[in-house]
């Protein structure tokens, strides 16, 4: 089925926590964050405003941009719409629950998720429109669009609600795995026919927006190893989609790109990421478990460049901005790399807390959200 042409398990969390503790421990000499080196900036980037929302706490919150507005949220229940041109607050709402995931918005409706399964949807003025509860923890931002609000739970459920009324439309349940990562794994619309989602166990699925049934499903990679920890093989981050090609990456697995209409594999490379990748019509870029950033030709998978100068700095999901690759690190630095060769072209500083989510572009303003709730607007010149 031509989707794009036709339409413009119980979680053993302790072990998963141990996996991340091992990966980020500075007591391991191999994991000591690489000191930043000086360089001559060749891209002029200006900080034009700053704002604040609630801290992320233990959870990773992602900003979302629609037009000239950016939507952000924090663990304390704060949800905010900001004018990205000025940094001024348009509206701010306090949800009466601690949040664990957000934000999703189509510019009209805005949705966030709570740890105990609460789904809160706000109208254009920021006032609560409806609330629903799902059975499971929500760590990934809801997806809003095509008349639906779609949420996913840590145990592999994807649930769709009617955007205006909150009526539950369908539920998809992925097969359970013995152990998975408690991390944000987003979703991506494929036109107005399907939604793409990756799952624990390494699977990538295109779900029918009308019914929740799979159009296709394919493995990004397969579990390897003997122990349950060694066999963790989750798709991390949101699947990317440009044209008819979608790419996804797994933890302890592979980076792969696929035909979005059929799920047919186009190419794959050994890779492991806890955050996700970025894609445009020429390259796919991501940081691996060691925070070594690599770029690949999107058509062939050929390696283009590799930058190990951010090794062990826990880089987040990249954003492709013109001729630059932009990503944050564990100390709140925003790094701009040349998309041609991966060298540094600019660097900006925030509040010193981690930047895990991808930056977003709202109008001509690049916006980043830190773990401490700092919202920063930058403009390259």
Swiss-Prot record:
S-diacylglycerol cysteine-type lipidated residues: 23
Disulfide-bond pairs as recorded: none
Lipidation (N-palmitoyl cysteine): 23
GO cellular component: cell outer membrane
Superkingdom, natural source: Bacteria
Location of this chain's protein in the cell: Cell outer membrane
BP-aspect Gene Ontology terms: Gram-negative-bacterium-type cell outer membrane assembly; protein insertion into membrane
Span of the signal peptide: 1-22
Keywords: Cell outer membrane, Lipoprotein, Membrane, Palmitate, Signal
Topological type in the membrane: Lipid-anchor
Cited Pfam families: PQQ_2 (PF13360)
Similarity field: Belongs to the BamB family.
Function statement: Part of the outer membrane protein assembly complex, which is involved in assembly and insertion of beta-barrel proteins into the outer membrane.
Subunit structure: Part of the Bam complex.
Classification via HAMAP family: OM_assembly_BamB
Protein's name in the database: Outer membrane protein assembly factor BamB
